[in-house]
């Protein structure tokens, strides 16, 4: 058992292979957080808490004359609100009498021999290889009939602990839940830095690192999606922690909507670490008997730096979040027509692209935006999911059949959650769009957001999508979402439920995705939101790969894919080779470099292959062959970042097979100088006592030698040039 409970049922120690998490219900039934870190025994660590009268830190009535006992200074597992803890709370409740108070105390616990599900939301699931365990701690509110269940999952071999919570209203009167996070954790004695991932459209997930001080460090999204601007995954690490040293705690929210993640030192220099649904524009009305569930947060600890932490997240997401026919099945190398044609295409153009792609070994053609309704630009047509047979010279089934006869798979782009005002759907159902009565709604890309909380909207979309997919025998769908959500108002929701709409929107999207995939179980679904605007573990439950960014510039992609790698498996990274000058930056990079960067992802092309040179066509063949050769290595192997957050003139990364029989190292020169210095890089992950041959010069050395001495290139890489180096075990 990974969940250990003391004989008196008040001390809980969650054990994974390399980490421990401990909490304790004290004599006043306050649930205290004692420890999360390197694996320890099950001894009670409550002695680590130093209680003292801090002044202006009030005392609950159970403390009697003891002024040292204060909710304002104790390391808590569930900090309430309005009752004496003045730090950021985890939960806020407005009662029927208008008061704000939440004071939850320990009541009981239950242990389950399997992982837990969350109604209507994605969560880690059990496999034949590993099943989780679950601890449910029931807390009761001191002065009302409200029950809070803290839910902990443990995946012992993966070094993962999950947190979620469920609030149940057992009282006679309704309550308003105005904040409820997935977890809160008070860390007592370390100085931490936070690593988070910021950005913007076409430049997502830039890794940034700042110290956690008494001023709060907070990131989040109120855009209705996890967003391009911040990612719902952060790391708290000890000062100076690096790839191979230092303590690190990761937190990754399995959710695709508004979120917040925060850390702050308190007056005792304890760090309160929190994550969950953003409280802005959030208010859930709970009648008697109703409940609210938070999304799941995935926690993981590494005592040996960031690389191990990332590898733990890669494994848990790849094995226990990603699902479906393509969880492990080899994914086809694709060609997408978007940057080749944008909206200006017809059947003839698409078939020419497919014919050339097939000759070069590409396995699937994806038809992007513009095939439906009156969609000649991005100002009309969204919602009218009917094939424009005039533009396509027939039905989608006819085009798909022609592609399939070439021996290729066929994919299609959709943007189900959006609607154009210039569409037949909007003219028939204007109330299906989010819009506040009396206000002109905000437009973005000249489109509005469908009310995904409505069952009739989801039924329409499900019928349209499944009909097209089944009729044309579609193999792949790219599911896009090209704006943020605002003007949130539902014409069918009660007014006292409007504070629920942002969350219910996400639940509606999840519901549609679940039913769509159940109806099309063999489909490969690739997520997208203007690229990486919804690149999160919640969406990965439905789409095992996500278009990582609308920016296909190979040099910008180094930063984007670097930031993505801290939490998300390389197999989830949608990454393509595109034309130069690049359409987003105007930069010109070597064709080989573009391929090497895209190989660190699901791999494909965004161009008209009829317009490239014969030399470049040969490079496509070589890249396609390389993808097949290294597929298992890049999609299932261990990933190492060899260059870091500090400024360098090259970027390098490495894949190592799980059996350590081979490794692939890639270097890209990012800056050039006069009288250039040699490139020297680390090598990681090779078995210490095995011999490996390097493909550069056929040098054979022990793994421990490569791991410690590294690799020097004896050739000068020009700016933006790349090189792949393979290490093969000598048997």
Segments from the language model and where they lie:
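Carbohydrate-binding surface patches
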Residues: 243, 644-687
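Conserved, mostly hydrophobic/aromatic
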Residues: 18, 165, 289, 335, ...
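C-terminal beta-sandwich/jelly-roll accessory domains of carbohydrate-active enzymes
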Residues: 671-731
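Polysaccharide-binding surfaces and accessory modules of carbohydrate-active proteins
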Residues: 5, 10-21, 30-264, 280, ...
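Active-site neighborhood of glycoside hydrolase catalytic domains
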Residues: 393-395, 427-429, 433-590, 602, ...
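Short Pro-Gly-centered flexible turn/kink motifs
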Residues: 100-106, 284-303, 720-728
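Aromatic-lined carbohydrate-binding/catalytic grooves of carbohydrate-active enzymes
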Residues: 326-463, 476
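Glycine-rich, aromatic-flanked loop segments that form ligand/cofactor-binding clefts
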Residues: 70-117, 243-257, 300-325, 362-369, ...
